[in-house]
């Protein structure tokens, strides 16, 4: 019997694992391949000068792809979708401009305006679904369907839903089409807009509803969002597929011996992360540092973003260290005692929170950061929703080594049970094996 063939469509270099989304996609592909599925990646990538670090496939990329035995069908073009180059460049400027303005000016400059007065209104328009339509991609996807003959198609993010136009009516009857959503994007977009921030995709509820209803099966990243998608698409099969980091051997918890508590934050450079970390440092870090021996280690692309938006912030706090991007997550987590995520808004499942527990690190986060976690997770998590909460919580942990050890033990236990492949991927595996 031939193995089930999956054509997996994305425009993210997920093997780099440089963001939470890439971490999750990489692990999903890994799980499917190890479970006997034949997986081919249909990868849209741009070869213009825009974001060269993200769009150009380097020798290091090739080495990683070979090492992971990934079957990737590269679809390159020097002609990106309509206006995407201009808009993506503006998006990055707008984020930096917004936070820089908030820190240096009494008034708040509207982030809905371009960073430069010389930029046109067209340039300042946020990206939409239409901007992600690569003009040649439908034909390319049709070619891949014919040559690979998949049993299932998994498309990453609603922005690529238009690729289903490549399937003929006959193919749609035979091929199981799944959408991996990552977020309820119209709700996430609304949350950003309410705070005067730029979201990477300007999408309405109507647009997202129309897109998700094109699919047979919708993958929600957590239970609450599954309920949202069931309301948006009552005729579609909606299931939950979260994130299962590659399992480590059982963690050995050593009693803490350092007098200094090291807390850590790792993140990409999106506006939610940038605002959350900046507010935490500005509102809570000084009083925390005055009451206990503590240091903060920051890693990921957030380091460059916060250095650009708030260049003096690190000069004001000698007990904050920046690692930048790390090649392995373990390089970060082995340096810290406790992970923090002061996220104030957002949707989906906070991948950084899953990873903290996975590495056996106690997690301090907000109510928003708890989205997608079960009640059983509470022994290894602490919730803070105000600057005062953050001060009291971290001071308590720093001054109470036995409390830190008990939190670590609970996190280590949860890491072995709460994120198993069986728990995370069983619904997807069942749908793939029995749907169509």
Locations of regions flagged by a protein language model:
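Conserved nucleotide-sugar donor-binding subdomain of glycosyltransferases
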Residues: 86-162, 194-212
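A charged, aromatic-enriched C-terminal amphipathic alpha-helix characteristic of glycosyltransferases
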Residues: 402-432
